[in-house]
Amino acid sequence: MAPLFRFETEAEVIEAANTTIVGLASCFCARDHARIIRVHEGLEYGMVGVNTGLVSTEVAPLGWVKQSGLGREGSRHGIEDYLELKYICTGF
């Protein structure tokens, strides 16, 4: 069971969705590609599903924002959190 809400504008949807203190995942339905991009960019969530539930794969980063925590797991983005990046410049 999931609650459904009706909104008049995209701005209302984004504002209502972003009022939560956590930001692990969100899903929404839309047909228009430009609308999908606008809403996705406005949402403060680590993962966003469009017209589907979220499917986890080894190439998809699992991430959090807000009080869900910070960081990424999975994919190269998650691996990079565990690496120490160094730069070296040598001349011979």
Q: Which residues make up each language-model segment?
A:
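Conserved C-terminal structural/oligomerization subdomain of aldehyde/semialdehyde dehydrogenase
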Residues: 1-92
